[in-house]
Amino acid sequence: MARSAFFFHCVAAVAACIAATAAALSGTATFYGGSDASGTMGGACGYGNLYSTGYGTNTAALSSALFNDGAACGECYQITCDQSNSKWCKAGTSVTITATNLCPPDYSKPSNDGGWCNPPRQHFDMAQPAWEQIGVYRGGIVPVNFQRVSCTRKGGVRFTINGNSYFELVLITNVGGPGSIKSVQIKGTKTGWVTMSRNWGANWQANNYLNNQAISFSVTSTAGKTLVFEDVAPSNWQFGQTFTSGVQFY
């Protein structure tokens, strides 16, 4: 069983910071993945099965202008259909989604006719169940207003350790507050702190030998808050295991 993580220090009030600074912006939204969102599993953030990792069906693939090479993975956006510009909106509705995937550009199509995710467009290719909360299925694409919001998660931040004896590939999931991660450090009971780098999506890498050592992480969110997850993985951890901490970024 994973040990509880401990709070280290905070340099920003996450929810208040996001709420105070995020202004509504204009964009567009389409949908994919089928009525059960089964086609949205996996994705460029590396979250895998979105049901078991807790993200569910309120998710979206972001255009590259928003995805930011994976730095936006885990962020939450409140999306409202712009009724002033479309008859396909459902009045008085909004949905909060989590960024779990990349909507890649398609340069063979004009950005206003099929190339919805081409830069610099701010576009959300939403899981169909999420999209249908704000838009009528026949519409296909709708104009939206969106803003970044604080993420609410069940339970603590989770760490899935993959790789091999000299290569740690750690997937960080279920991040509350800002939802996204700015930087990560890793430490074994016999090592000092080592800075990790983003490998892809929400996966972070380091080259250490940490076998038979309890593992700690120092994680800084994109809102500037740092938590230390002390010995979150016990010394008998195995590759492929997921460890759940006892704290969140709020």
UniProtKB/Swiss-Prot annotation:
Record carries keyword Cell wall biogenesis/degradation: yes
Expansin-like CBD domain mapped to chain residues: 166-245
Expression tissues: Expressed in roots.
Protein's UniProt keywords contain Membrane: yes
BP GO annotations: plant-type cell wall loosening
Gene Ontology CC: one annotated term: membrane
Residue span(s) of domain Expansin-like EG45: 42-156
Signal peptide span: 1-24
UniProt keyword terms in alphabetical order: Cell wall, Cell wall biogenesis/degradation, Membrane, Secreted, Signal
Topology relative to the membrane: Peripheral membrane protein
Disulfide bonds: none
The organism's place on the tree of life at top rank: Eukaryota
Subcellular localization(s) per the UniProt record: Secreted, Cell wall; Membrane
Function: May cause loosening and extension of plant cell walls by disrupting non-covalent bonding between cellulose microfibrils and matrix glucans. No enzymatic activity has been found. May be required for rapid internodal elongation in deepwater rice during submergence.
UniProt similarity note: Belongs to the expansin family. Expansin A subfamily.
Protein name: Expansin-A12
Species of provenance: Oryza sativa subsp. japonica
